[in-house]
Every structure is written in C-alpha cells, then in structure tokens.
Amino acid sequence: MTTITITRPDDWHIHLRDGAQLKDTVRDISRYMGRAIVMPNLVPPAIDTETALAYYDRIKAQVPAGSQFEPLMVLYLTDKTSPDEIRRAKASGKIVAAKLYPAGATTNSDSGVTDVKNIYPVLQAMQEVGMLFLVHGEVTDSAIDIFDRERVFIENTLSKIVADFPALKIVLEHITTKNAVDFVTQASDNVAATITAHHLLYNRNHMLAGGIRPHFYCLPILKRNTHQQALLGAAASGSKKFFLGTDSAPHAKDKKEAACGCAGSYTAHAAIELYAEAFESVNALDKLEAFASFNGPDFYNLPRNSDTITLVKKSWDVPATYPLGDTNVVPIRAGEAIDWQVE
C-alpha cells in the first residue's frame, strides 16, 4: 500500500507550551490535526476556568490562516480544586476534561494532587456533569522503581477510582505497559487509553543500549520490548478503547542534552507519519483510521471530523532541529528518515 486516505485525525494529548513557543508548536500540530487535547501543566498551571480560557485564546491566536484547528482545554486538578470549579469549567463549553497529575510525577506537576482522596468530591462532580477525567498513571513514591510506577498506580489507585466512580469517563494517558493494556481492556466502556507514537516505535533499548539517547527520555519512561509489543497489539486490535495521543512535549535542546535532562519527546512535526510506520510494522494500516480519527471523538462524544488527509509512502529526512520560540527542539527521528508523509 503506497497511499492511504483517512478521516482527519485528532491528537488527544499534547503539550503546546506557552509564550514564544506557542507559534511553533501550534504550527506543527495544526498542519493536519483537527483538534487536540491541550495539557494544562504550564507555569503556573491552568487550575481554574479563567486561566484555561485565557490559554485557549493564546493558542487560537497562533493558529495559521486557513486552518480549522480547535484546541480542547483541560483543567489542572489540585488538592484545592472545588466541585463548583468543575461546573464552571463544564459550562464554558471549551473545557472538556480535568487532569490528574500526581504531585511530582512529571514536568510541572508540583502543584498536582498529593492524595487522590482529596479530589473525590471533584470526581463526583465530574461524574455528574459528564466531564472526562484524564490520568497521568504513575505513583511518585521514591521507593517504587521507575519502570514499575505505572503498574503500581493501576493496582493501588486507578482500580479504586474506577470502582468508586463507575459512571466517570476515564482516560489513562500515554500507557506504556501490558498491565495498562490489560486493565483498560477488561474495564468498563467508560475507561479508555491514549498511546503515543514513540511508545509504539521504541523501547528502553533504543534509549539506553549503546549510549544514552536523551531525546527518547519521557515519562512514563519507555519500557521493555514485551510492553511495546502489547501496545502495538492494543493499537492495532480495532478496540474502540485505544486512541491517538502523541504526548508531544517539546524542551529546548540544551534542556534535554544535559546532566539532568527534562522528560519529553517531540513528535508533533510528524505525528501521523510516525503512527503510520508503527501500524505498518504490524500489517495493520487498515486499523489506523479508527485509532487516529474515530475512537477519540467517539469516546469524548464529539463529532468525527468530516474531511480527510492522504498519507503517501514516500521517505523524507527529518531536520536536526525545529525552531521552538527563541531556541530549538530536537524532534524524534532527527536527522533520519520517516517512511510516510502527508500529501
């Protein structure tokens, strides 16, 4: 197969950053994505409706002329988030979800939730108004090995939330383990997951064997090949529970290539192209459209996009860097080829 036409896809998890960087991140993701769930972990984070809506306006101001790209906003949950704030956010019409960052789990998560029981009244309000609950599913206990933090979170925390709030729609984001695949598969239809392109294409050997490659360092961290294969199986299974979320997370080159580098991989420059490679690797290009264009909007109760994009099997070389505000970002596959491109 050398050409594929699919319904315009959406990205159900992205970091666009803010300030001078917005112009570059929005340019990249709006090339062919119809919508994107925009993460709220700014500095300071988008912890209330007013802040999230102001961020929406800043993003929209950077959408290139002629693009119909629409950002979907997310509230950043803290120990102090109130049920009333959830109702305000829902009423805004622009904020479609609220996000759990366990305090300290990832970039700019220090304001996050210290104990999930602190937000139980908020989860009840979300269940009542129909707001989605997005979860960074890792524990932050320093005694837990970094490769086990997703599994332990599912066993100790997420399983209880799912049981206590059966009507709450939950997205376990950027899953990285067979444990997560199995949990989501066996859970009710109210539980779904996003999967990144880099977790489908790479495992921890790519990051650590033969030298440390910091641009593969992200959270949750890349796992064993057996987990990578489980993710590929889930994405290509045709299950409606799994959909596209790039978790594209830009950091300046010098912040990644450092003694203590930041977590995050940049894929917005070639998101659907990288997913096409992943699906082709398991002979499942016929399943790409549902994963990229149908399952996400269906789970969010939003209309599917009505137009299409066409992918062509034509190799191209990725630049060594892309502009990122007043600095540069090194993208995934920098200086190497990608097999597919959007026509």
Curated annotation (Swiss-Prot):
Cofactor note: Binds 2 Zn(2+) ions per subunit.
Binding residues for substrate: H15, L16, R17, N41, H136, L219, H251, A263
Any one annotated GO CC term: cytosol
Enzyme Commission number(s): 3.5.2.3
Sequence positions that bind Zn(2+) 2: K99, H136, H174
UniProt cross-references to InterPro entries, sorted A to Z: Amidohydro-rel, DHOdimr, Dihydroorotase_CS, Metal_Hydrolase
Catalytic activity: (S)-dihydroorotate + H2O = N-carbamoyl-L-aspartate + H(+)
Residues with PTM N6-carboxylysine: K99
UniProt xrefs under Pfam families: Amidohydro_1
Cofactor: Zn(2+)
Biological process terms in GO annotation: 'de novo' pyrimidine nucleobase biosynthetic process; 'de novo' UMP biosynthetic process
Gene Ontology MF: a single term: dihydroorotase activity
Keywords noted in UniProt: Hydrolase, Metal-binding, Pyrimidine biosynthesis, Zinc
Residues that hold Zn(2+) 1 according to the record: H13, H15, K99, D247
Annotated active site: D247
UniProt keyword Zinc, yes or no: yes
Pathway the protein acts in: Pyrimidine metabolism; UMP biosynthesis via de novo pathway; (S)-dihydroorotate from bicarbonate: step 3/3
Similarity section: Belongs to the metallo-dependent hydrolases superfamily. DHOase family. Class II DHOase subfamily.
Known partners and oligomeric status: Homodimer.
Name assigned to this protein: Dihydroorotase
Gene: pyrC
